[in-house]
Amino acid sequence: MSIEEIPQGADVNVIPKNEKKARELIKKLNLKQIKGITRVTFKQRGNLIYAIDAPDVYRSAAGTYVVFGEAKVDDMNQRIADAQAAQAAETDAHAGHTHSHGEEDKSPEAITADLEKASLTEKIEEEEEEGEVDESGLDAKDIDIIVEQTQVSRAKAVKALRKHDGDMVNAIMELS
């Protein structure tokens, strides 16, 4: 079939020569094709996301995956900036309306204030727990390791160790 015979607007996938060779090699490796996957995303530092729509996914016996498809770069920072700009435009459009419909304020400033308020209450609760902690019967090295591994207060580490009868692994798993 030549290019002239393909109808206008038809959805045609052209497979590059290298990809075709790779697919043939995969068939020789006895990888299983996984059906039903509609999208694969890979996240990288800095909110950079690579998305593959309608991928061909293969799984090896060892549990590794091979993904074929066209990767598109999706910058989450740009999406967030666009969403904030749209929300700011919407807020400006509704600036003339001062009456409330019983809804909470969803502006970025209100959300930030709510988050700060919530984090302050958590800090107050943590400070209340921080008082003198009875470490008798527990190894100080165990407590230090749990604090180092889970980044929690010494009081929480002691509490978790006591709950699990001195079992460091279960205490770390609970706090992680």
Swiss-Prot record:
Record's compositionally biased regions (Basic and acidic residues): 91-110
One of the record's GO cellular component terms: nucleus
Disulfide bond found in the keyword field: no
Gene Ontology BP terms: cotranslational protein targeting to membrane; protein transport
Key words of the record: Cytoplasm, Nucleus, Protein transport, Transport
MF GO annotations: phosphatidic acid binding; phosphatidylinositol-3,5-bisphosphate binding; phosphatidylinositol-3-phosphate binding; phosphatidylinositol-4-phosphate binding; unfolded protein binding
Compartments where located: Cytoplasm; Nucleus
Ranges where the record places region Disordered: 83-110
Gene3D superfamilies registered for this protein in UniProt: DNA helicase RuvA subunit, C-terminal domain (1.10.8.10), Nascent polypeptide-associated complex domain (2.20.70.30)
Residue ranges of every copy of the NAC-A/B domain listed in the record: 16-80
Main localisation: cytoplasm
UBA domain segment(s): 138-175
Keyword flag Cell inner membrane: no
InterPro entries: EGD2/NACA0like (IPR016641), NAC-like_UBA (IPR044034), NAC_A/B_dom_sf (IPR038187), Nas_poly-pep-assoc_cplx_dom (IPR002715), UBA-like_sf (IPR009060)
Subunit structure: Part of the nascent polypeptide-associated complex (NAC), consisting of EGD2 and EGD1. NAC associates with ribosomes via EGD1.
Chain's role: Component of the nascent polypeptide-associated complex (NAC), a dynamic component of the ribosomal exit tunnel, protecting the emerging polypeptides from interaction with other cytoplasmic proteins to ensure appropriate nascent protein targeting. The NAC complex also promotes mitochondrial protein import by enhancing productive ribosome interactions with the outer mitochondrial membrane and blocks the inappropriate interaction of ribosomes translating non-secretory nascent polypeptides with translocation sites in the membrane of the endoplasmic reticulum.
Family of the protein in this entry: Belongs to the NAC-alpha family.
Protein name per its UniProtKB record: Nascent polypeptide-associated complex subunit alpha
Organism: Scheffersomyces stipitis (strain ATCC 58785 / CBS 6054 / NBRC 10063 / NRRL Y-11545)
Gene it is expressed from: EGD2
